[in-house]
Regions:
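Short coil/turn motifs at beta-sheet boundaries
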Residues: 37, 74, 180-184, 189, ...
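Conserved ATP-driven motor cores of ASCE-family P-loop NTPases powering translocation/secretion/packaging/pilus
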Residues: 14-22, 33-44, 50-60, 233, ...
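Primarily NTPase-proximal linker/entry elements flanking Walker-type ATP/GTP-binding cores
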Residues: 1-88, 92-97
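P-loop NTPase catalytic phosphate-binding loop
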Residues: 58-169, 191-277, 281-285, 319, ...
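Mid-core helix/loop region of P-loop NTP-binding domains shared across ATPases and GTPases
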Residues: 169-193
Length: 361
């Protein structure tokens, strides 16, 4: 239920928000959420029960280009992952916290769109390999990732050259044709956006020898470059892991600072929650630490505006997600630079023996 209130002179939305707990008890509802609609008007959203106990996504929720409904917020609205608004995101969570479920929903939501999906799965591909028919590239260990990341950086630089060539501004060029990113390019010239999924990012930082340390430094530098410059080139990062902080090594905190979106599932210690949320929404750290193990998929999402909320991802089986990727395999965009990294498709055995072809003269 929604109510809109016009504020009295001298009131501000914070005054109404401070009364939300009293209103909840007065009206006998589960929660009351207050949001500002416009100057002088606030909206009260009344929720009668805990909608995160059994997740049902809103019926009117529809996906849009680079916008994926992935979870339900505690105020009963959909949590939408908007890559145009928040290009890069860090998702943390312990084992069995629901982090993989969140990742599945992202892949399934992007699969029907004209988007190149690229994966770096440091668990030998067990998380992303089932989605291989829809992936443009897949690396399953740090060695393969070290080969893939330079290609993505070069792809980004090539796209900047394309944008720069378009900016050869002549006096007769209309203002609307001047652009600083791929979205200002004509449809016929605009390359497909790329979403890079990195699962278990900490594995990219682990080293045992001097040679591996040099490789690690190169990979981290390339990830930072993609995070800093990739948005205008249509390259977006989705970085997942169990822990992510300064103890991983050089460049970890610099990379984390570029990941604007934050999602924190259940974690094993308070330090992990602080890694995800303390620098953008400090008050959300306690909420993340309070997530119970028996509620997988529950998480806290925050952004650099300081706002945060609890969300929960609905259940999606791996087989259903893989089926969607198989059905949309024909939608993989053409990105020649990524062809060497395209995962091989398993050959399905024939139901009956195939007759041999006649030998011609």
């Amino acid at each position: 239920m929604r109510l809109r209130l016009r504020l009295a002179p001298g009131q501000e939305p914070a005054d109404v928000a401070a009364s939300a707990e009293r209103l909840r008890h007065a009206w006998g509802v589960h929660a009351v959420y207050v949001s500002e609609i416009k100057p002088g008007v606030v909206e009260l959203r009344l929720v009668g029960f805990d909608v995160l106990r059994k997740v049902r996504m809103p019926r009117r929720t529809t996906a849009d280009f680079l916008k994926v409904p992935v979870a339900l917020r505690e105020d009963s609205t959909a949590c939408v992952r908007d890559y145009r608004a928040i290009p890069h995101q860090l998702t943390l969570g312990a084992t069995l916290s629901g982090k993989s479920m969140y990742l599945r929903h992202l892949v399934v939501g992007l699969a029907p769109q004209r988007v190149a999906l690229v994966g770096i799965d440091c668990k030998r591909g067990v998380e992303l390999a089932p989605f291989a028919p829809r992936l443009s590239a897949l690396a399953t260990d740090p060695a393969q990732a070290a080969e893939l990341l330079p290609v993505l950086v070069q792809l980004m630089e090539d796209r900047y050259d394309l944008i720069k060539a378009r900016q050869g501004i002549a006096p007769s060029t209309p203002d609307e044709e001047i652009t600083s990113d791929i979205w200002g390019l004509p449809d016929a010239e605009r390359p497909a956006p790329v979403v890079l999924f990195v699962d278990e990012v900490a594995e990219l930082f682990l080293v045992a020898t001097r040679k591996e340390e040099d490789r690690r430094d190169e990979m981290v530098t390339q990830l930072i470059r993609l995070a800093q410059l990739g948005r205008a080139a249509g390259i977006y990062l989705e970085v997942c892991g169990q822990r992510f902080g300064a103890e991983l090594g050089k460049g970890a905190t610099m990379l984390r600072a570029q990941l604007t979106g934050r999602v924190c599932h259940r974690v094993n210690d308070e330090a992990s929650a602080k890694m995800a949320l303390a620098d953008i929404a400090p008050e959300a750290v306690g909420a993340a630490c309070a997530i119970a193990p028996e509620r997988p998929g529950l998480a806290v999402v925050g952004d650099t505006s300081g706002g945060w909320s609890r969300i929960r991802t609905p259940y999606l089986s791996l087989s259903d997600a893989a089926a969607v990727c198989a059905e949309t395999a024909g939608l993989v965009p053409v990105v020649p630079a990524l062809d060497p990294f395209r995962p091989a498709m398993p050959v399905q055995p024939a139901d009956q023996p195939v007759p041999p072809l006649p030998v011609s003269d």
